Curated annotation (Swiss-Prot):
Organism: Campylobacter jejuni subsp. jejuni serotype O:2 (strain ATCC 700819 / NCTC 11168)
Gene3D superfamilies reported for this sequence: 3.40.47.10
NCBIfam families: fabH (TIGR00747), PRK09352.1 (NF006829)
Protein name listed in UniProt: Beta-ketoacyl-[acyl-carrier-protein] synthase III
The protein's annotated pathway: Lipid metabolism; fatty acid biosynthesis
Enzyme class: transferase
Cited Pfam families: ACP_syn_III, ACP_syn_III_C
One GO BP annotation of this record: secondary metabolite biosynthetic process
Membrane-crossing segments per the record: none
PANTHER family, sorted: 3-OXOACYL-[ACYL-CARRIER-PROTEIN] SYNTHASE 3 (PTHR34069), BETA-KETOACYL-[ACYL-CARRIER-PROTEIN] SYNTHASE III (PTHR34069:SF2)
Length: 324
């Protein structure tokens, strides 16, 4: 039966590395403290002349090629980001469409913070299985450095830049089995990008987070969510080939891994080298596993994410891309 399948995965990783040692020179922190609390050792930072759309475009071109398609085969572009090129418009998706030479196609952004890629999978699955679209390009892209206060040691240590992309199309096998998304806006003030309005045309954005509260809710929510999606689909955790979570904090990842009783071999962890890249983190981690030969065609994959909003989600899929 023809159903939605993730036919490719790719990423773009900026060259510049911002290490914990570098941050020690910028704010009152230490490599030991950052590593112990987060598991992060370094993160990537885009250059000044790279916008979020540029990062997304580079990942998109690789994803399209790996799906054995051309840009003109794409009939919808969906982007998840909390760091768009422009504050209101045009959308980052429209900028990427322009970069790819595409017009007269659907292109829009969604705002679901770190859960963004899960939300994209759900939307792309619905679009292709309804027959409205054939090949949907989904992109998580972030230049979080553009909204980061590098004087705030509580948050600047966490985030990095990057992009990941994939193509969702119909296929007879290796389907996106299930996607679950949810939200609770009552906790919105615990993790937000605050707007400080200097004038009607001049605004400064900065990310703010109450980390301890976010940590507790994230662990409980994600642990319950992954258990529920597995039970709903009559799948045992031990049947999962790879668990690829949002890369926010090593302690959160390990807590959910322990809940599922999964071995380290089945858990993909990249937070140590990229930090939290928000909506880009899952596809970036997937691409690392793909290029390392760990993610193969037909593998059963469990994804999960939690982000500002609060938003969260999980997905079960059999990877439909050709082996690297």
């Amino acid at each position: 039966m023809l159903k939605a399948s993730l036919k490719s995965i790719a990423s773009y990783i900026p060259e510049k590395i911002l290490s914990n040692a570098d941050l020690e020179k910028m704010v009152d922190t230490t490599d030991e403290w950052i590593t112990r609390r987060t598991g992060i050792k370094e993160r990537r930072i885009a250059s000044e002349n790279e916008n979020t759309s540029d990062l997304g475009t580079k990942a998109a071109l690789k994803a399209i090629e790996r799906a054995n398609l051309k840009p003109e085969d794409i009939d919808a572009i969906l982007v998840a980001t909390l760091s768009p090129d422009y504050f209101t418009m045009p959308s980052t998706a429209c900028k990427i469409a322009s970069n790819l030479g595409l017009v007269n196609i659907s292109a829009f952004d969604i705002s679901a913070a770190c859960s963004g890629f899960i939300y994209l999978l759900e939307q792309a699955k619905a679009l292709v299985e309804s027959g409205l679209k054939k090949n949907v390009l989904i992109i998580g892209a972030e230049k979080t450095s553009s909204i980061m206060d590098y004087n705030d040691r509580s948050i600047c240590i966490l985030f990095g830049d990057g992009a990941g992309a994939g193509v969702v199309s119909l296929d007879n096998e290796n389907h996106i089995l299930d996607v679950h998304t949810a939200s609770n806006g009552n906790y919105g003030d615990l993790l937000m990008t605050q707007r400080s309005q200097k004038s009607s045309l001049c605004q400064t954005l900065s990310m703010q987070m109450k980390g301890n509260e976010v940590f507790k809710i994230a662990v409980n929510t994600l642990s319950n969510d992954v258990v529920e999606i597995l039970a709903k689909n009559n799948i045992l955790a031990q049947e999962i080939d790879l668990f690829i979570p949002h890369q926010a904090n090593l302690r959160i990842i390990k807590a959910v891994q322990e809940k599922l009783n999964l071995s380290d071999e089945k858990c993909v962890i990249t937070v140590q080298k990229y930090g939290n890249t928000s909506a880009a983190s899952i596809p970036m981690a997937m691409n690392d596993a793909y290029e390392e030969g760990r993610l193969k065609k037909g593998n059963l994959i469990l994804l999960d994410a939690f982000g500002g909003g609060f938003t969260w989600g999980s997905a079960l899929l059999k990877f439909g891309g050709e082996n690297f």
